[in-house]
Amino acid sequence: RVFVAGHRGMVGAACVRRLASEDCEILIATREDADLRRQDETEEWVRMAKPDVVIVAAATVGGILANSTRPAEFLYDNLVIESNLIEAAHKAGVAKLLFLGSSCIYPKLAEQPMREDALLTGPLEPTNEWYAIAKIAGIKLCQAYRRQHGSDFISAMPANLYGPGDNFDLQSSHVVPALIRKIDAAKQAGQATAEIWGSGKPKREFLHVDDLADALVYLLKFY
């Protein structure tokens, strides 16, 4: 029994698609079933559903503009969602939990290509530090439960994702869907150029969300 928290998001939906080919029962919870920002509702739902595995793909996400204009929402929502799910899984005796981190957890000036041991070695990228701080807290919370309780709670840090179910809203989208929409809009309007934010200097590594789902299933089985 695998509970995919955040099944409506791009990563969660990819996990549901991938798990459909596995010998498991997929569990999902809508906002009406449980508001994951509420500890009591989250713990009650997990206790009643009795999952063996929890995938924490639920999060408040967005691009540079969303991060910069809604910092409190990004920090608060993500802190409480991950904390509620991890504590609920612990209390319910869940056998394994997989928390989804993010590549933005690494320092802005981390050596390229980035290594896992670069975490917490320097200042974060200011444009998404609120989301990054919440993700770092989730990673450390899983480590703390492993150390204190022996819980099999692990974390995975995907690269920049794209694929089915992506967000194309220019106010909150990530770089790939934003580029696609801007270039398509320019082409449709017969414009010779399209405005792209940033300096063009940052290095990105992109990963299709279905490839991530394959990797996550592998981690659940063998890590």
Annotate each PLM feature:
Residues 39-79, 88-91, 108:
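NAD(P)H-binding glycine-rich loop region in Rossmannoid oxidoreductase-like domains
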